[in-house]
Amino acid sequence: MYRMFTREEALALWSRLVAGWAHSLDESGARTLMDGAPNYADAGGSYEGVTRMLWGLGGWLSQPGRSAVVRWRGESFDTAALLRRALVAGTDPQSPGYWGSAPARGAYDQRTVESGQVAFATWQTRERIWNAMSDGERANLVAWLDRFGQWPPQWRNNWALFWALNHASRKALGAPYDQELIDSVLEYLDGVYCGDGWYDDGPRRGVRHFDDYNAWVFATHVLSWAQCDGDSRPDRRDELLDRVRQYMRHVPYFFAANGAYAEYGRSLSYKFARLGAPLWAYKLQAWPHSTGMLRRLVGRHLRWYVDRGAVRADGTLSQALTAEGSLEIREPYIATGSTYWAMLAFGALWSLPDDDPFWTAEEEPLPAEQGDFIRVFPQPGWVVVGTQATGAVQRFNAGSQHYPAKYGKFVYATAAPFNVGLADGRPSPDAMLCLTDGQDLGHRSETLASVVGEPGWLRMRYQQKVGGGVHTVDTTIATRGEVHLRAHRVTLDATAQGPVAVVEGAAPLGYVSGDHPAIDGDALAGWEMASAGGQAVAIARLAGYDGQRRAAAWKGRDDLNSVFGHYVLPALTVDRLQPVHELVCLVHIGGSGVDPSTLAGQVADASWQEDGSFRLTWSDGSSVDVPPLPEEQAER
């Protein structure tokens, strides 16, 4: 019997998280001492473990009349006292828990990131915390915010929003602030806005950095600014909220029926932080879907992480996505407390009144439950495919770029989460075409040109450096439910030394400890397959390949997956590429009911045309025509 997401369930999880966090605090109450992989920001305890918990505490204490006391397993935790203690100790230069001195003027410093939510949480809780502070405590807090709110040389990415929220919240508190800085950041947003709700995370449009920062910085910080300072510029507020509303139209399509997210990009250690934007959008009437759909999305997404061990036994958040997933999901900047950016979800959730209709609305199905869909997003260069039969979602990426394992795969699928760990310093070839000289393994680097289009195709040109040469690859992908076709035209650099080979992985089939995947293949028919837990991945060669690899852990490393503790990867190979070599294969990611021997028969013809276009004809007679790529990538 299906269990709807309730306020009681949310409160129980919140109480567990508060208890785990409170038990991790140092003696000052301004830093956390947690297990994990520490970095430089953990020296003396993680300040981020406290500053980021302020998202949740600020939301919880923002509602008048709500008790500050949270109870978990017989213990009581006074969240107002914990918040005040953190703010006082963290901003007192004489405290051992002090959050740090000022950087060089204008430098980008991690504490500038934290200053936004420190200021915003103080504004949210002004009646309980700010007004109860002594003059000296308020002076220390404002001085700390000012130290980390000085003008930088330029606005270079989403960090601009941290400066803006710092100053806007101080303005709302009646403290000193810089209106020119706030206005400058709001103007910066126009320079990186690409339309349809999407922001390019760079100093200007055209760098093609699209990922979850659209949710957990651009959208959330615009929504935060709208709450504390939006009334001062109502026209600008409404314009920015309309952009959020456009972005929110897309959001539900990235979630599977079971609440899984098509994980992709950096900072995935922040986990369910992505729920903050839709919840605040709902609060500010910028959520364009039903309240019931939002309730289902929030509940299922939180459960997905909890059910997979993202919250440890002691009630603290892990840096990995799940209990078994690779810790290599974390970037070097992710300290032990950095994961508490996830508290954005609870900050937005608890900003809703206890009697909000959100808690009583009848849950409504997510798009992946309603029917099959293909959504094309030209701005980030994505195609998102949902399959009702399995409830799974696949995100195909042609245009966005950054770290190779987290951005360079062809597809990021809820049914087959990507391998994030590196083997011998190189990404696993799952959902990648990798050139190799026998020593080095290439991967998709900078995308030279890309385009996506209806009814769900992608085309991209990129380079790989292998064997002393820079080789060019033109890849076309056409999607059709759980199956997609990949076609590559590889042009080798004539100056390269020695032969160049290929390995191309399907997608990794992840499985939990104790499970045993079924593995099969047919070298003559040209397919390989693996299945476990009701899921399957398969790859079949149509043209250009001369070998294949039975599904196994890449280089014997079965600890590379972002979600699962184990995986296997079926792959195709080419022993030696010709100067211009064309490759075509078909990949299945989804339910285990697939018959791999029938995959190749789904395609009647797939070929490049004289004008540079690519034509695919499926066996049912339907066809897809993909136009040639431009020689240079136009600004988006």
What is the predicted role of each segment?
Residues 46-48, 376-378, 481-483:
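Short, surface-exposed loop/turn motifs at beta-strand boundaries within globular domains
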Residues 69-72:
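Long, charge-dense tracts
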